[in-house]
């Protein structure tokens, strides 16, 4: 798995078979290159992942979280506030993450939402898996509207209604919501970099807003 995650016994997909990764537990962790980051045997260490990112595209899912009314109409658009990797500033972004080895698209959507919004967010996963757009992130600025300095990533983009309570997890500092019909939306989108604002605009157009 690309994000060094070992499923806990009570995880929603803990019982799913993963072939060579079955029966790996947190006790199987090994230390890698003295970095202090734990990597299970046979999984990609940071150096290997970095090399692969420089050589081939990486599959991602990107989720635009929304609140919807009883008729399914979008009433709010959500975003995450996170500290940048270098710790310098807080950035506004969307839910995104790699599709792991031997993981379905549907499972990747559910796992990444749970990772960022918590276990009681209660996402209403789409019945079909046709994304509203496919965003190609390139490490070279200007190749497309989407930029990721680390890698060439191909992101399947989905709008997912969130019915439960959101409790920020991991690097997420807060989850903020905005009514897409108000003037606050423009300010909201201006704070998104690297093409994530364009993804939100496409999501709104897809939803008829």
Give the positions of each predicted feature:
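Active-site segment of metal-dependent pyrophosphate-handling enzymes
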Residues: 118-166
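A structural signal for short, well-ordered beta-strand segments
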Residues: 63, 109, 158-160
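Nudix hydrolase/Nudix homology domain
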Residues: 2-13, 86-92, 151, 157-209
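Conserved Nudix-box catalytic region and its N-terminal flanking loop in Nudix hydrolases
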Residues: 72-120
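Hydrophobic (often cysteine-bearing) scaffold residues that line and stabilize catalytic clefts
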Residues: 57, 101, 105, 196
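Acidic, metal-coordinating catalytic segment for phosphate/diphosphate chemistry
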Residues: 3-4, 8-71, 147-148
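Residue-level signal for short segments within beta-strands and strand-turn junctions
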Residues: 65-67, 81, 161-162
């Amino acid at each position: 798995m690309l994000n060094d995650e070992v499923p806990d016994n009570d995880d929603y997909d803990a019982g799913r078979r993963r072939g060579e990764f079955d029966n790996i537990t947190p006790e199987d962790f090994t230390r890698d290159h003295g970095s202090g980051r734990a990597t299970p045997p046979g999984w990609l260490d940071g150096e290997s992942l970095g090399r692969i990112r420089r050589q081939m595209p990486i599959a991602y899912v990107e989720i635009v979280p929304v609140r919807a009314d009883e008729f399914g109409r979008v009433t709010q658009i959500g975003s995450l506030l996170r500290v940048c990797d270098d710790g310098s500033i807080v950035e506004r972004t969307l839910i995104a993450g790699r599709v792991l080895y031997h993981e379905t698209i549907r499972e990747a959507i559910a796992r990444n939402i749970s990772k960022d919004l918590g276990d009681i967010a209660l996402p209403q996963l789409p019945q079909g898996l046709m994304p509203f757009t496919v965003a190609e992130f390139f490490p070279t600025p200007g190749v497309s509207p989407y930029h990721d300095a680390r890698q060439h990533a191909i992101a399947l983009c989905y709008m997912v209604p969130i019915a439960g309570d959101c409790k920020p997890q991991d690097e997420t500092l807060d989850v903020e919501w905005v009514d897409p019909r108000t003037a606050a939306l423009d300010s909201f989108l201006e704070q998104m970099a690297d093409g994530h604002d364009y993804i939100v605009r496409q999501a709104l157009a897809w939803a008829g807003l």
